[in-house]
Each structure stands twice: as C-alpha cells, then as structure tokens.
C-alpha cells in the first residue's frame, strides 16, 4: 500500500445493560464495523472496542424486579450483547463492561485529577425525592412538561422534542417515573464538574473543522445559551461506583460510562503484550481516536467528555462520527406493530449480511435518519447481491469448471474494462474512508452492471455451442470471474462472510492492494451457492415474532391504521396534470421561527445553484427549527410565489401527517443532491 499506516482506536457507544440489542443499535455497530474493516484492509493498525454501560438506577430497579443481583443481570446481558454482535459480524477486538476494576480505577483517577485541578465543586442542592420509594430521583426517573417548549412526557434532564437541557426541578408538573407519585423537594450535597471553565477550549475544538458541520452548529447553539456546571454525583441507593471519601454518594452513570472506552482498551492492553495504553490515551498521543455515536448523545460526547479528558490530562477524540435514528417502514419502531426488532429475532430468520448491505446502501457521513423499508429491503438485497454480484460468478463458473477443469485463461479478455474496475478503487476507497458508504455501494453496483452487460453481450452460453471457440469461451468466462473478484474485494468490508465464501471459491485472498494483478492461469474451486435470496415469508416471520414478543411482555396492541380513513385519496387526475408539478430536492440551509406566528417556520432552501425562501406551517412539529438545518427535503419548485404578511413564499416543502405536532418532513435517501428532480 502507498499510504502511511496509522494507529487508530475506534469505539461505538456503549449499549445499556438493561435490555436487548435491536436493529436501531445495529445501525451504529454496522457502520463502524464497515469503516474499521476497510481501514484494516488498507493496512492501518486499528483497534475496535466497546463495552456494556452497566450502571445506574434503571439497572438497579430492573434487577430488583427480576429478584436478582444487578451483577448477575448485567453479566447475563453482556453475554447476550456479545452474542448478538458476533452474529452480525461486528469485529470487536475487545468487548468489556463499565462495571469493572479497570473502569473503577480510571473513573477514580479522572475524578481525583479534576478535583486536584479545581474543576470539582460541591454544594447543597434541592432535589426531587420519591416519598413512596424513599429515594432521590435521577433525571431520567422524573417526567413532566418541558420548561422551554412545554412538550409533555419529557425526562428530567433534556427534552427530546426541542433538545433543551435543564434541571429536573425545572419540569412542569413533575411525576416520579418509579411510583407515579408527585415528588417532594429534599436537600442533598452533590458534586459538580465545572464545565464552563472549558468554554474557550471547547469553542476552539469546535472551530477546528474536525467535527461534522451539523454537530458544530449544535455546539455553537449550546455555547450561546451558556454552559452549566454538571452534576456528577447521585445519592444512594444507586448501582455504580462510590465517590472517593464521600460515603453514600455515587458517580453519575454518564461520568463513568465514557471512561468505559478507556477501560475497555486498558483491558485489551492487559491481554496483549504489543499494546500500550498511554500510546493511545496520553495527552500527546499521535494515534487517532474516533467515537461512533447516535445523535441523541451528542451533548455528552461533544461537551462533557472532551472537557473531562482535558481537565484530567488525557487526549481528546480526533472526531465524533454521528448518525441518525432508524425508522421502519417510514415510522418510529413499534413493539406493538412488530417493527421493534431485536437483533436475536432478526438473526433467527434472516442473514445478518442482508441488513449490513441495506444499511450500507443508505448510510452517509451526514446525521440523517435511515428508514428500513422492508419491501425495499427484500428487493434491493435480492437485486444487488444475488442477481448482480453472486449471479456473475454463478453464470461463468459452470463453464470454467466443466470445460476447463477450473482453470482461468492466461490473458485478460478486455483489459480496458478490467482497468475501469481496478481504477475505481480510489473513488470507492475514498467513499468508505469518509463514511459515504451509500456512494461506495452505488459505484460498486454500477460496476456490477457493467460486468453483467459484458457477459450478456459476449453470450458465453451461445459461444459454448459453437465449435472451435473454446479459447473464446474460456476468455469470456474468465473475465466474468476476474470482475467478480474485484467486486467482492470492494464489498468485503460490508459483506465479510460472503467475502470469505468467495475467497474459498476463488482460491485466493481478497486484498485491496492486489487488484491490479488479475488471476491468470489460476485454478478456481467448484462453485457452490454463495448467498440465498430473501423471501417475503422470512421478513413476515420476523415481524410476527417481534409482535408476539411485545404482546407477551405486555405491550398494548397496535391501533388500526387510520390514515386513509382520516384523509381519503383525492379524485383521480390525469398524468398531464401531475407532470406540471416540478418537485426538487432541496437543502435546508437555514430554518427560523417567524416572529408573530405560532405556526410558521421560515426556511432558506438551496436548490443547487439558487436559493428559495419558503414559509411552512410546521413549527408545532419542529419547535427547535435549527434541527432542520443541513437536512435534505423535497419541495414544489414551480409553485407561484405567494405574498404573505411575513414575506414572499417561493414554493412549498413536502410533508406527511395530519397536522400540528404530527407532521413529518419528507427526505430523500442519502446520495440525493440539491436541485435533483423528483420523478
């Protein structure tokens, strides 16, 4: 390889140890695994770690409900999580737990360094207390209306609607999530991390250009609203680590959870003689450190975590790689509808690599939500993996094995076509490296189309019947096998198990840097089925089992779908009428509330060379308009401008839903560009 080998440490967010892994979790772990596998293929020294987040009140309470010790519950869950990740081919070098000796030592060390450096303060606070359960209530065990946007049923630390952060005591009409009673105020001494002391450092880190633009924009918003001291302690009863020299006080789970990245790596270092902890975590480390996380935990990873590391003299992350949520069939995952799918349920019915491929085909470096459309899932996997890639090997291997004893031709039949495939390595590699996996998949499938077109045009099944054309037949089919090898090498980070089967069939490793040398006069092995089609019945079984599991757990039955009943299909129009509507992909460059209107947002849209101003009545659904900035949507571009009291509206954005808070802005798949027509 020509590039300089790097030392890289990669982590995924730590799954919480009180529940099973589901397909929402798997998006992140698959995204990270694809990136890690590509980096390994290019010769980088990369270590991939994770752990269970094993502390906190939820774990303590669930263990009580089960009648077992928290340690027993988290050990069982850790084994289940590791089994699920292994089933999806997630190639962790180490999977640990935050309830470990290493994590306690590191948490204590970091706390003591922060305290010695003057970044830990203590003061008496008024805290919500559940008089029925005789316990102070953590943030996530108090619910009420958000003090900023007044959205109901929000947790005590942050609002999932507007993104605001606050204290539990700020909630409107708070209730205990443990007992349902109204909590009372009690005083307690707590310890605080002086986050505001790191404001300038954090601003500089944000401006460095390393972070995703959407993350940097959100951090700037937090800076403008002012950083607050962070409560890092909790009162007994609590399952976690005790604060040194403070009996009855425990580290808040979000203090020791990210330290779990460090302790999981330290645990790996103890197992291997060739690794040094300081080489990756020392403040002057030259290694790269990347955290793959979901957008729901950006606040903790972009503010608290870097500041904690800075204040305790450890290195900060090189970057955060943030992704969006997973929806199923265009809606939030639902247990009652069977679309809240556990990893183990999926694996019992479907090949893990089908989901790996589908997620890869949709993922990008942006923080966009990914929709698992089950019909599209079946169609895309069957069309791409089975029909385009595997079928390329199948339709050529038979002739090579039967007519030429498995031996490929001594020359390449179409050197220009082979060069096209090999030269694509740079662009495809750049796409993998920059986490633009959807682009990588598009480029790989475009090559697969070229390969199949070549075979169709050369028609080896016809050549095989013509006397005296044995050499032509061998050359054509060998070319098909050569192109299959290149495709499978490119797909290896996404489909590692299929790549292993392809490697056995081809009798040669699939190495990125070896592609320029074709397999000449090489003997392949007899072809065996490499991949199976997805049948609709398999997907139906996953949904039904998931629905039954939810029912057994006491989840409410799904309400009948009523969208059509509430909004009947409009009268039929002819095609000419529809063709008059010019819909385009648009990038939301800016989103603002409209002073004097409680319904409208002002959107500045980029159509790829021109800007439009649109007023849209979606404010109730998006009370924090900045969450829309940087998002792609669909707009009607040729709608006549409309003069409104607040200005000129130059089009209309497309959304679904009955109105009010139930409005869902439409977004195209990753890969669409501003200005593209929607057909």
Curated annotation (Swiss-Prot):
GO MF, any single term: metal ion binding
Name the residues that bind ATP.
335
Please tell me which stretches of this chain the record labels as motif 'KMSKS' region: 332-336
Q: Which SUPFAM superfamilies match?
A: Anticodon-binding domain of a subclass of class I aminoacyl-tRNA synthetases (SSF47323), Methionyl-tRNA synthetase (MetRS), Zn-domain (SSF57770), Nucleic acid-binding proteins (SSF50249), Nucleotidylyl transferase (SSF52374)
Q: Which UniProt keywords apply?
A: Aminoacyl-tRNA synthetase, ATP-binding, Cytoplasm, Ligase, Metal-binding, Nucleotide-binding, Protein biosynthesis, RNA-binding, tRNA-binding, Zinc
One Pfam family cited in the UniProt record for this chain: tRNA_bind
Function, as annotated: Is required not only for elongation of protein synthesis but also for the initiation of all mRNA translation through initiator tRNA(fMet) aminoacylation.
What is the protein's given name? Methionine--tRNA ligase
* Gene source species: Sodalis glossinidius (strain morsitans)
Q: What is the lineage of its organism?
A: Bacteria, Pseudomonadati, Pseudomonadota, Gammaproteobacteria, Enterobacterales
Gene expressing this chain:
metG
